[in-house]
Each structure stands twice: as C-alpha cells, then as structure tokens.
Amino acid sequence: MNDKVSLIDMPATPVAYFRHVGPYGPPVARFWMERVAPWMEENKLLGRVRYGIAHDDPTITEPAKCRYDACVVAEPKEVLSGSPLRTALPGGRYACTRFHGTVDEVDAAWQRLLGGWLPTSGLQLDARPLLERYPVEAKYDPQTGIFECDICIPVKPL
C-alpha cells in the first residue's frame, strides 16, 4: 500500500447528523448534496468538519438496509433547525489516510487500509465506528465528482 497512514488521537466529538438508509456510493453523495448541505447552509454550519459513518458492510447487509450517518460537528446546546439527530463520536486512536478520488474509487481505498495496511501494522480494529472525515478545507469538484476526505479506522494494540 502506497498511501501514507497517520495515527491520530481524536477527541470525543459532538455531532448533529442525518441518517441515509439505502445503498452506499452515489446515493450517499446525493444525500449530502440534496439534504445535508442545504441544511448546513441554513444553520450556518458550512465551515465545520464533517464526518460520514457507514454502519454496515454491503457484502453482508442488503444494500437497501445499509445505514450511513452524515454528521457535522455541533455542540449539544446549539439550536439547529430540521430536527437533526445528535450523538458524540467516540475519541481514541485512529489510523487515517487521505483519499482523493470519486465515489466509485473510495471502496478500494478502504480495502487498501483495512486489507493492506492494517494486517502488517501491529494494530487491530476496535469497536468504534470507521469514519470518513471531511476537513473544512476538503475539496469537492461537482464537475468531475472528485472529492477529498480522510478515511479513518479505529485501532488498538494487538
């Protein structure tokens, strides 16, 4: 695996989120563009870090039942329209690598991290969620569909 992997200790992070149920890939991209981004703009949240959490493995769970949470950092006491769900992403050590590509390419990047890097790292997954982290400066090109994010897996010693 040629991707640079960094170990990052993330703090617990309060978020507001909306859940998409259905296939991953282009439907999730549409969910962000049609539902989440307008809500973020309405609530003046566009300059914040965002997270994506895919809860299910579509090779095990029927794609129509796969769950994905589109999250934005938000303090619990912030008043937000649209009735978002709230939670705190658990803190801890994550192995992260920068992704730059299209929705169709992101699965291969996950596989390189999980199947290529992790087995030789001296670490193992723990029970916290796998994350796509979208830093404030992350780019998205609507013409090409190319976007940037950090893909992050929760790790602990073997």
Residue map of PLM features:
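A solvent-exposed interaction/effector surface
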Residues: 1-158
